A protein has these predicted regions:
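C-terminal catalytic histidine-bearing segment of alpha/beta-hydrolase fold enzymes
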Residues: 109-181
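Primarily recognizes the serine-hydrolase "nucleophile elbow" in alpha/beta-hydrolase
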Residues: 1-71
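Extracytoplasmic/secreted proteins, especially bacterial periplasmic and envelope-associated proteins
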Residues: 24-28, 48, 100-103, 133, ...
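Short beta-strand/loop motif that positions the catalytic acidic residue
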Residues: 77-79, 83
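Hydrophobic anchor at the start of a short beta-strand
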Residues: 14, 75, 114-115
């Protein structure tokens, strides 16, 4: 951010996106910023992203429920309801909550924050590799929610058999990571 001018970057127009661990990173970064956490102290006062796009992401809130001390930037969440690698709902690691997109969206909806959530019914972690598959949804989110600043809230479940399954997901063994099914 300190080199934004020399790089020709508008710091007010930065949108971050990630899938799986990258989605966890971008969602956690936004949570840290909105809650004034120590990790966000390296950023300029008042900085926030213009938007966040997450494909199979979650956060570690560490204390209590999912709360945002200030309104988060517009968020687009995509997650498979049967994800066993990054939880769609929530799990606990050593008394630390790992809250997925379904839990995050409840807070966003309850507070009336600017977000879109696309739940892929029955899909698993392959949603982490669907950035190209969701291109039209991404472009609409970027144009309407981010660039125009419109509060377009979408929270929907999709039954999409056309979601491509990457080679690493075809065997199904990855689904047994922390569940017995």
């Amino acid at each position: 951010i300190e080199n934004a001018e020399s790089l020709g970057i508008d710091p007010d127009a930065i949108v971050v996106s990630g899938s799986s661990a990258g989605a966890i990173t971008v969602l956690q970064a936004e949570w840290e910023i909105c809650n004034g956490r120590q990790l966000a102290s390296v950023l300029p006062d008042g900085f926030n992203y213009a938007g966040v796009m997450s494909f199979s992401g979650a956060i570690f809130p560490r204390q209590g429920g999912i709360r945002y001390g200030m309104e988060p930037c517009p968020m687009m969440l995509c997650h498979g309801t049967a994800d066993k690698i990054v939880p769609y709902g929530q799990i606990w690691f050593f008394n630390i909550r790992f809250a997925g997109s379904s839990v995050i969206s409840r807070t966003l909806r309850r507070k009336g924050y600017n977000y879109r959530f696309f739940r892929f019914e029955g899909n698993s972690h392959e949603i982490a590799s669907t950035m190209c598959h969701n291109f039209d949804r991404e472009m609409d989110f970027l144009e309407e929610n981010v660039m125009k600043g419109r509060r377009v809230i979408i929270d929907t479940t999709l039954a999409d058999d056309g979601v491509p399954v990457p080679d690493w997901a075809k065997g199904g063994d990855y689904r047994k990571l922390y569940n017995k099914d």
